[in-house]
Amino acid sequence: MEDNKFKSVLLVDDSYVDNLINSKMLEACRFADNITVIDSPLKAIIHLKESAEKGALPEVLFLDIRMPEMDGFEFLEALNAMPEMQGAHVKIYMLSSSLDPDDIKLIGNNQLVAKFISKPLTEKILNAIE
């Protein structure tokens, strides 16, 4: 039996349908042993703080841009300000249907973000993530 690529992944998106599609693709591609889906950026911040305290941060984080409460960029600012995240090795991918050039430029300028990925996740995209 083949092992999954990563131990854990966190998907942060307010869209139920996108979460369903993307989590099914993550499962089908055997991307991670543990897939956590959170539909609120504020809940995700709490989850990450708790995970950091346990030494169990996800290896990969897929983050939507357009969400209520706070957008993906505000989420990244909050994450960057968290002492628990200093020195953490979490690969962050902005996963969005937004093709706004300003968003893509902001992503390119953000050192926390590994890459922008247009929704939905595909097998090809997941296979390219190291």
Give the role of each language-model region.
Residues D3, E74, H89, Y93, ...:
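Alpha4 helix (beta4-alpha4-beta5 surface) of REC/receiver domains from two-component response regulators
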Residues Y16-I38:
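Two-component/phosphorelay signaling modules centered on CheY-like receiver
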Residues V37-E50, G72:
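Helix N-cap/capping motif at the beta->alpha junctions
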Residues M67:
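Receiver (REC) domain active-site loop signature in two-component systems and cognate sites
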